[in-house]
C-alpha cells in the first residue's frame, strides 16, 4: 500500500481516461485499493429491482477512479500540480502544491 497524498474534500482533475479534463471534489478515499470517488466523474446507471426496503428504478452513482488518473488542482493557478509534504516552523506537516508553493487542503484555508 502506498502513501496517498489525497484527502476527502480535495479539488482534483482527471488527467487520463474517458473523463479527462473533468474537475470535482473527492467524496471518498479507498487507500487499500489506491482509488478515490470524485463527485460528478465516472458516473454509471444502476438498474435496481423494487423490494421492501426501497423502490426500484434507475439510479446514477459514481464509481472509483485510480489515483494515478487524477491530479490536484493548484489553488493559486487552477492548473494540475504535484503535491509535496513540507514542515512549517511550528513543526506541523502540510501538503504543498509543487508549482506555486501554496498550501493545499483545510490547512491552507
Swiss-Prot record:
Q: Name one GO molecular function term.
A: rRNA binding
InterPro entries this protein is in? Answer: KOW (IPR005824), Rib_uL2_dom2 (IPR014722), Ribosomal_uL24 (IPR003256), Ribosomal_uL24_CS (IPR005825), Ribosomal_uL24_KOW (IPR041988), Translation_prot_SH3-like_sf (IPR008991)
Bilayer-spanning residue ranges: none
Listed GO cellular component terms?
ribonucleoprotein complex; ribosome
**Family membership:** Belongs to the universal ribosomal protein uL24 family.
Give the quaternary structure. Answer: Part of the 50S ribosomal subunit.
Please give the name of this protein: Large ribosomal subunit protein uL24
Amino acid at each position: 500500500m502506498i502513501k496517498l497524498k489525497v484527502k476527502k474534500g480535495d479539488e482534483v482533475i482527471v488527467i487520463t481516461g474517458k473523463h479527462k479534463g473533468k474537475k470535482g471534489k473527492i467524496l471518498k478515499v479507498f487507500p487499500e485499493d489506491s482509488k478515490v470517488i470524485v463527485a460528478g466523474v465516472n458516473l454509471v446507471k444502476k438498474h435496481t429491482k423494487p423490494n421492501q426496503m426501497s423502490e426500484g428504478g434507475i439510479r446514477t452513482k459514481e464509481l472509483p477512479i485510480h489515483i494515478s488518473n487524477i491530479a490536484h488542482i493548484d489553488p493559486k493557478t487552477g492548473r494540475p500540480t504535484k503535491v509535496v509534504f513540507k514542515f512549517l516552523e511550528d513543526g506541523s506537516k502540510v501538503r504543498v502544491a509543487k508549482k506555486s508553493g501554496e498550501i493545499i487542503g483545510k490547512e491552507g484555508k
